[in-house]
Amino acid sequence: MKFVVWPSEIDSRLPRKYGRLVKKEVALEAPTPEEIRDAAEILGMKVIEFEPEKLNPRLSGIDEELRTKGMLRIESPYPKGKSLRMICEKIRELRAKKRKAHGKRKKR
């Protein structure tokens, strides 16, 4: 299945009115297009198109700080909803690993 993914679809700071598609408990704070791309590729999904500067038209009416730029066209064997939940879970794992690695470096 091919579909478009906007970072706003998995951003916990946004209400569903502005395009969040996953539950707030599953969503992430301020996901970046690069994080989404990396997570999708690790999960075996194919990123067909990647436009980090594109803005979701739904976000034109909200505060600048909540506007998350980026658009990805992804091909996945799973439906969009399941793919988004998997991507959120993988980004959460990657962020935890990054924090853990960063924390280890500080201890000397």
Swiss-Prot record:
Keywords: Cytoplasm, Ribonucleoprotein, RNA-binding, Signal recognition particle. GO terms for cellular component: signal recognition particle. Gene3D superfamilies: Signal recognition particle, SRP19-like subunit. GO terms for biological process: SRP-dependent cotranslational protein targeting to membrane. One of its GO terms (molecular function) is 7S RNA binding. InterPro entries: Signal_recog_particle_SRP19, SRP19-like_sf, SRP19_arc-type. It is found in: Cytoplasm. It comes from the Archaea. The keyword RNA-binding applies. Belongs to the SRP19 family. Part of the signal recognition particle protein translocation system, which is composed of SRP and FtsY. Archaeal SRP consists of a 7S RNA molecule of 300 nucleotides and two protein subunits: SRP54 and SRP19. This is Signal recognition particle 19 kDa protein. The gene is srp19.
